[in-house]
Design a protein with these regions (language model features):
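Hydrophobic alpha-helical segments
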Residues: 1-308
């Protein structure tokens, strides 16, 4: 990873825990787990809380379908780590041949008309949110979906629009296919939190999204709140950030995180003076890009409701 503190653990206990989990599991603890263990109160806790609720909580979309949504979000963002991870999990919950075909080209795969319809919508939501309209929402509603089903699917893609940007900005190490296969059963069964998780009723995605936004963009941190908010807005296509190194990285996180270079992250670390500060700015940009899509989707849901 580009931030060694995140890779090794933010303190003695975290470093020890990472080594212990790696030893017990027989494989290197994936970077997706390391990132939510680091600076937990800032990012890990609100992010894993919403992710667990969206991916394993109550929904008319099956767990396998939600994992497929995550895999395709990763594909639409060219994130190799997340494509492999979520394809492996989805393949345990659904037919592997079907999952592989859907990841290759969901329009040609033998998916239900309902799943294909939501994927057409989600692709626009993920890749070109400014092109999303109420008509797109009405189209999927006419396929028999409820507004709640649309919101549930949007929550998955919002979360993984954040995760894929962090995976590529921080340059997650990519395990071999065997390690992805070994970790997939645990992920399918337990989900996105360590230990036990109680999920009661349908997730309140709007409240969970707001909790994430407030913590990352308004809560205490090493970096100034105004700068974190500026990074978030820039990643969502907003105005330039005053410092060139910050602006360059935030813009790239928003547009195509897989193109980020070591040098871009290094410049931000040099400017901030420490890895935790750089981590906060990278997270702020990724969260800004994801929540921009979420808010756009909610706006179109509201407009579609008023039109229907």
């Amino acid at each position: 990873m580009r931030l060694l503190q995140v890779e090794k653990g933010g303190g003695f206990f975290q470093a020890l825990l990472i080594r212990f989990i790696s030893m017990v599991s027989g494989m290197r603890l994936p970077d997706a787990a390391r990132i939510v263990m680091y600076h937990q109160d800032f990012y890990g806790k609100p992010m894993t809380g919403w992710t667990q609720a969206a991916m394993r909580g109550e929904s008319n979309w099956s767990v396998g379908e939600r994992e497929l949504f995550a895999a395709l979000t990763a594909k639409w963002n060219s994130c190799t780590f997340c494509v492999k991870a979520h394809t492996a999990i989805a393949s345990l919950a659904l037919d592997k041949t079907l999952v592989d075909a859907a990841v290759e080209d969901f329009r040609q795969a033998k998916l239900s008309s309902k799943v294909k319809a939501i994927l057409v919508f989600l692709e626009i939501f993920a890749k070109t949110p400014d092109e999303l309209t109420a008509e797109h929402v009405l189209t999927v509603l006419h396929e028999g979906m409820t507004q709640q089903e649309v919101e549930d699917a949007m929550a998955v893609v919002t979360l993984f629009s954040i995760t894929v940007r962090l995976a590529d900005a921080l340059n997650f190490a990519i395990p071999d296919d065997g390690d992805f296969s070994r970790s997939a059963p645990r992920m399918l069964e337990k989900g996105y939190v360590f230990g036990k998780s109680k999920l009661l009723g349908h997730p309140d995605h709007r409240a969970l999204a707001e909790a994430l936004r407030k913590r990352v963009l308004e809560g205490p941190g090493t970096m100034d709140i105004a700068l974190r908010q500026a990074m978030a807005k820039r990643a969502a296509g907003g105005p330039a950030v005053g410092e060139a190194a910050y602006d360059d990285l935030a813009r790239q996180i928003g547009l195509a995180a897989y193109k980020i270079t070591d040098e871009q992250v290094k410049k931000v670390m040099q400017k901030t003076g420490n890895e935790k500060a750089a981590f906060e700015l990278i997270v702020a940009a990724a969260v800004g890009a994801g929540l921009y899509r979420w808010e756009k989707g909610l706006s179109m849901l509201k407009e579609a409701h008023e039109l229907s």
